[in-house]
Amino acid sequence: MRTLINMDGAEHAEFRRLTQDWFMPQNLKTLEAKVTEIAETFVDRMLAMGGECDFVSDIAIWYPLRVIMMILGVPEKDEALMLKLTQEIFGSEDPDMQREGTDEERMQFMMDFFMYFTQMTADRRANPGDDVASVIANAVIDGQPIGDMEALGYYV
């Protein structure tokens, strides 16, 4: 599977163009209120903790995740799963982030990630919304819809 990070030149530009409109200043303006609302939720959470918290585990890992999930269109109910999968993917060398069990069991996180986003892609193809996942799911390159693997590469 190829991701934007692994692409160069024209291929990278072509895939980047699929979602770049979402990140143009006029569209970021529309996201600003939602991002501010999420930030206020986390400020309220800190206040409810009496002004003291473990900033990393209580705020720093959750706030950016919630913003990214909102942009993608991932429901908040899946937040714990998304954190777990994100930590397993990007912290795969960190023993604290790895699953227990055999090598096969520990690698199951990739299948869980792929299954989640394959289902999400299928849903957005059938029911497009106003989110980046819908843009990715319904993207066309060279006159052809992108395949599931190309779409999955975008989520990584």
Model feature map: region roles:
Residues 1-156:
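Cytochrome P450
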